[in-house]
Amino acid sequence: MAYSFTERKRIRKSFGTRDSVLEVPYLLQMQKDAYTAFLQADKEPRKRTIEGLQAAFDAAFPIVSHNGFVEMKFIEYNLARPAFDVRECQTRGLTFASAVRAKVQLIIYDRESSTSQSKVVKEVKEQEVYMGEVPLMTDKGSFIINGTERVIVSQLHRSPGVFFEHDKGKTHGSGKLLFSARIIPYRGSWLDFEFDPKDILYFRVDRRRKMPVTILLKAIGLNPESILANFFVNDNFRLMDSGAQMEFVPERLRGEVARFDITDKSGKLIVAKDKRVTARHTRDLEQSGSTHISVPEDFLVGRVVARTIVDADSGEILAKANDELTEALLKKLRSAAVRELQCIYTNELDQGAYISHTLRSDETVDEFAARVAIYRMMRPGEPPTEDAVQALFQRLFYNPDTYDLSRVGRMKFNARIGRDESTGPMVLSNEDILAVVKILVDLRNGNGEVDDIDHLGNRRVRCVGELAENQYRTGLARIEKAVKERLGQAEQEPLMPHDLINSKPISAALKEFFGASQLSQFMDQTNPLAEITHKRRVSALGPGGLTRERAGFEVRDVHVTHYGRVCPIETPEGPNIGLINSLALYARLNEYGFIETPYRRVVGGMVTNDIDYLSAIEEGKYVIAQANAVLDKEGRLTGDLVSAREKGESILCAADRVRYMDVSPAQIVSVAASLVPFLEHDDANRALMGANMSRQAVPVLRPEKPLVGTGIERVAAIDSGTVVTATRGGSVDYVDATRIVVRVNDDETVAGEVGVDIYNLIKYQRSNQNTNIHQRPIVKKGDRLVKGDVIADGASTDLGEIAIGQNMLIAFMPWNGYNFEDSILISERVVSEDRYTSIHIEELVVMARDTKLGAEEITRDIPNLSEQQLNRLDESGIIYVGAEVQPGDTLVGKVTPKGETTLTPEEKLLRAIFGEKASDVKDTSLRVEQGSQGTVIDVQVFTREGIARDKRAQQIIDDELKRFRLDLNDQLRIVEADAFERIEKLLLGRVANGGPHKLLKGAKIDKPYLSSVEKFHWFDIRPAQDEVAAQLELIKDALEQTRHSFDLAFEEKKKKLTQGDELPAGVLKMVKVYLAVKRRLQPGDKMAGRHGNKGVVSKIVPVEDMPYMADGTPADIVLNPLGVPSRMNIGQVLEVHLGWASKGIGQRIGDMLQQQAKAAELRKFLDKVYNARGRTEDLAQLCDEELVAMAAHLRHGMPYATPVFDGASEEEIKDMLKIAYPDEIAQRKGLTATRTQAFLYDGRTGERFERPTTIGYMHYLKLHHLVDDKMHARSTGPYSLVTQQPLGGKAQFGGQRFGEMEVWALEAYGAAYVLQEMLTVKSDDVAGRTKVYESIVKGEHAIEAGMPESFNVLVKEIRSLGLDIELERS
């Protein structure tokens, strides 16, 4: 395999034993595909499929007026180009969206000429109508809503279809299983069927009052006879003068206890009374040729009549279907000469009489009565007219406008009720309802299985596209109502479509969804991993999903079908555990929204490289081997028994039974979990914490690649969009800190396209979490690039790999109690080298509004401020970029008009004379908050249309235009150079007809001539050949065209920048100031490894006091060894060992470079490291120069990849340690024989510690829980309104709560005065607080405690209950 630009600089040595059959797919595929399918922007309108926006429009149109003579038809929709790009939207606080314009026709039919069969068109009006704005997805899979980046999380919800379940015996005291079924449509009423403890079957619509199911069956057109015929088989009886003859059916007799003597037709006794009928008995009966059995009279009593019996002579109904036979009824039947009788066959075991009993409890008589009963249940209190009753019943399940099963629902429904076809109508049919009731009765009879609702075959994912489509449909439905009412007017008045359609409901629905839905979330941008995980998240919460409170254990638990689809590790701790999951690494969605995972096909024990994606439903049919199954050289499964999975259970089976095999061992985990090396050695709880905390790592100043990784780092970094990748191949033409200019390869440019790519890098941009997004170029001028190469690193990436922490030398040993209970002891060297220093950017906003008393003004002229306090503001009153500010410093000067106070005549006179204006305004400037300081790195000024810009705003616009012009000039420079190169090739050696500088006719054009002529005059040369002249003219036109398009682009940019900004109502001007704050590591900051080993920095120790090795190397971090055994995260120990080997090999390479070893020697050593164990690397691809350059990158540590579940073994780590530390080096460092431990020395005393200490390198992270953000102090501040107690929390500048337990502590000490102080003057004794202040000012330190306000509140509350309470003064 060929190495990419960054891989050539640093190849990661992998211990994976299996070659990748399938590359890790693009990690944001799910989000991007879903939204592309929703918009279908790049498809021609005629070729769009019916999904997304197209489906929403098709469902809403055509709209027909109430009288039917006016109709509005939808033709097609178009998406406009967004007015602002992503960066402009972020800066200006706008939504990155595109306007939807729908082409509609308003058709008016002629009333006079039209008949009921055909309508004659009178007039057609066609017009494009604005249909609201649809937010667009950025390249990174997020949305910009009101200037902030948001993510729409996919929702895992119960799939539409039919589900059968039971209550597990919880409802009834006896523990009896009550079965139920539920038909869930995508849109429309839910239909439930359920048994009660008395075995009567009921149905409910939308969880309303329950009714016997036979009412529904009658309502769909079945009569009692056909209901019984559908659910029961019949026993045929022939009535005799006494008793009867029953038709002999062997299956029905077998196993029953005979209630009478059974004889064959000759009268021979076959089964005696009270004996069980066996198979031998039924065989004897069959052999004797008996077709009927004589049964006594009492055998018939209590049987249920299957069909209505009518007297043939009189027409009188003798017995109705479902009547029970009594002796009287039998007598009546005999007297009416009824000989043949059909009764339903039931038994206790597998043919319960449930429907018969239900029918008996149902009082409705016919179809209409049943529908009236349903109407009364749905609309209690409304009079049931015939039309209303029929209309309601039709609307419930049979009307496509109100009921939609969806394609998924129909597919699942048909599969569950045993139909072969997967398509069908989107509404229910009578057969569907009947089939569901039949299956439910079968379940109650003991046949079949209930469904598992947590099976991923019964839960599907709703993606962004689908969620947005549902919102758009909602908006269109509201429009449809309004248009329908107004369509009638279009006949009388000359209205156009845009007069009828008001797009507000659509905009409102979309705005509400993207801005405020539970599934639209503020993007987690702490680091690239957090970003990518957020977009791959799958939530069971949200509208139409579960709620935290109601979700039980089963829903949250890991299910066997999660394998390869949903990560079993990465989920939040706390109330959302198991409800929010992450998609597994290779998972994708199928057309129905079910999660699929890839498997390699196995044919006759031979593993092929063909890949099939299976959903959870399909997977259950096959035997699937694990990814680490042993294969021989030909790729055949070896061994008698292979470890595999069948229906979710682990089994051992023969190789020829295996049909599929896992693609990769990492297939079961998510991106975050797959970045944890040695994950297989960590306890699941700690692995969960490790995966979750990796997402909270703060990007540090200088990212450093992990020495021990898993090989997914590069994929994750590229797919997250944090790094900049080359969109086309080419050579680097120009690089500086802010932009990279690439001259594109000729074969990758399309004719007429500019052959240059300019990448503007992001510099010091604030993320959603206030961390710093900053890109650094990693290419130099002249570098050759291939499409997809990483050309600039972003936050938390190093040479195109995710790097969320720093590699630290860790020693596992206690140190004076400073690492007790997971505390972390850290060396001062780490702080002084800025290893964990991070930059945080805060955005401070000030608005000048138009108030009732006049407009606020942003100005430098502020009352009562000295020149000293204003010296950092420019003449517009805005701070300059680069100023270092402290708490309380003014950032933007602003004054607000004050209300006019009533003045005495003298004051009025003085003011008239001296014009003292300053007291009219008050100072409302933007200042730096307490506890915050930093450097101003950027200022943005926004001005409303029609208000003059100040100098600062104009300067910002000029700078922006200058930058844009620079880009255009670069593009033009390269395009021109390219064009003149082509012209030179075209003209050299050609004969000319004349040209500038007195070129004679017939002269040959050569290089000296061309270099003597100005390039722009080359176009004046007249070649003799016509085709050459034509080509020259073409190049000239293309250049002119390019220049013109660049000028247009510049003008458009200028227009955008100079037009007024959209600001909130009443705001005239807005200034945003960005402060960059440097945060160094300090005690109280939270840190963690990648294995859930978290802790808080307890002390930063001078480097000379840290434990050190025999060669003088001091440890960076000292961790408590007791944090490992009980937590069972042994992965950290293995990481430390392999990290130690990595550093040792790096040092050996560094030594070789320092001694200027020959390239061949270097190659030999690297070949030994890379190709001794694990996956081999082809170093022959690298020339000597590249090899030495790579070695320079390896000198600080050899990067390893130990893939999840396929990582480095103990032997491999030992081998690497042996290569890294030969005996001589090991001795010098004081290492033990295993090379994993060393004898350390106490930095303070120089004494050697008694026992060897485990030491090595671990990738350690600083988390986004910084003590600076949490610590604050309050002396006086805001108080709660009712209780008058200080507020709580940093945001409210609150105090520390002195709670119940703290009061007990003071009581225990008997500190009465301290306690009184705490409960009164330091809390809510208002008068007392003021008096204490006064006494302190006067220098007297006396306390006069009064009544706490909260006590007064308590008294008032007791009085409000009607209990009088009074205080007695003692």
Swiss-Prot record:
The gene is rpoB. It catalyses: RNA(n) + a ribonucleoside 5'-triphosphate = RNA(n+1) + diphosphate. GO terms for cellular component: DNA-directed RNA polymerase complex. Belongs to the RNA polymerase beta chain family. This is DNA-directed RNA polymerase subunit beta. The keyword Protease does not apply. Its EC number is 2.7.7.6. Pfam families: RNA_pol_Rpb2_1, RNA_pol_Rpb2_2, RNA_pol_Rpb2_3, RNA_pol_Rpb2_45, RNA_pol_Rpb2_6, RNA_pol_Rpb2_7. DNA-dependent RNA polymerase catalyzes the transcription of DNA into RNA using the four ribonucleoside triphosphates as substrates. It comes from Verminephrobacter eiseniae (strain EF01-2). Keywords: DNA-directed RNA polymerase, Nucleotidyltransferase, Transcription, Transferase. CDD domains: RNA_pol_B_RPB2.
